[in-house]
Amino acid sequence: MSQTQVHSHDALSDHAFEDGVPYEYFDAARREDPVRWIEEEDGPGYWSVTRYADVVAVTRNFQQFSSETGGTTREDIGHEDLLARQTLIDTDPPLHTAMRRVLSPRFTPGNVHKEWVGFVEELVQKTLDQAFSRPGFDWVADVAAVIPMIVLGELLGVPTEDRAYLKALGDEMIAGADPDHAPRTADSPENVKENSGYPFSSPAGRDIWKYADALRDRRDGNLGHDVFSLLMTGNLNGRKLTTRELDNFFSLLVVAGNETTRMALSHGLLAFAQNPDQFRRLKEDPSLLNTAVEEVLRWATPIHHFRRTALVDTTIGETAIKAGDKVIIWYASANRDETVFDAPYTFDISRKPNPHVAFGGGGPHICLGNSLARLELQIVFRELAKRVETIEIDGQVHRLRSNLTHGIKELPVRLTYA
């Protein structure tokens, strides 16, 4: 077994990501110590897994590395709190399989295409028309945050007037230590601990639960074809979902159906602005759209990491792992692994193959909504290539202070139109 040095969590803290992903750190870690022990001031420490092959192996091996035991976020949560906030991503098979089955028929590629192509195309046209009425605007506020939130609202059957409120709660729930989006918990470990029973240890998680309860009361007896109605009537191992299970499904969808797609749209636009040759290629050859979207997903990697907990004594690579050890798998590092991706720091819209882990590394936890996210990205960037000649960044790019999610808060742009 390899001898592993001890490292500080400081290099991987929320603050370390505020100016961008610390790729140099990850590059060195993959070369020198791909499974390294990180000390925590607020916990027992964890194994930091940075190499693509190891990230994929851990992600797929739920028999040895659990999402249910310990949850999927770095902080250590008590057992009762974990059960209270348990979502689809915080379970292992067979419970995970049963929970996923409640919604999976609605998210197959065929059903997504049939139900959503027309709606998303019309929405994208309308949103771009409004944004493109002026040469300069904030891509995040005016496009990237608008489209996924409206899609999510339609998906869940959330009234139009409530969607901005849900967006704000979703922003806060996953904002980590960012003072703009999470003022109630930013740089306040005490507040995080006080809210550990709510999704992402955030008071916004509590507020989303309350909203879901109120929506359920309003919808009782007035169900439709939306996913919230499906949750209210869904079958989980022969029974209906409990109130808390429904609340947790709802909170997860608010994040997974909105925040991560917004991040990919934001980083994709930034990548095209910084690589005008690739934008020109897409304009000249629309057949590159699908590979372009996959490269945007690799480039963006909306979720930096997730946690697993070792269930047995085992190994990752050549490193011995003990039962009960916390393991952090870094998708942000895996998607820049030079042993898998040629020229990983080159944004190449024709990259093929492109086995990125933006939706997870395979196995039972592959992102349920990946087909809908891809559809939104494809339509936005297809229309962008048709309607825009050049993209320039027109001010400072403000990033989210978070080591969990790869968010951009503001992206001022100036476009010239075709």
Model-predicted regions and their roles:
Residues 1-418:
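Cytochrome P450
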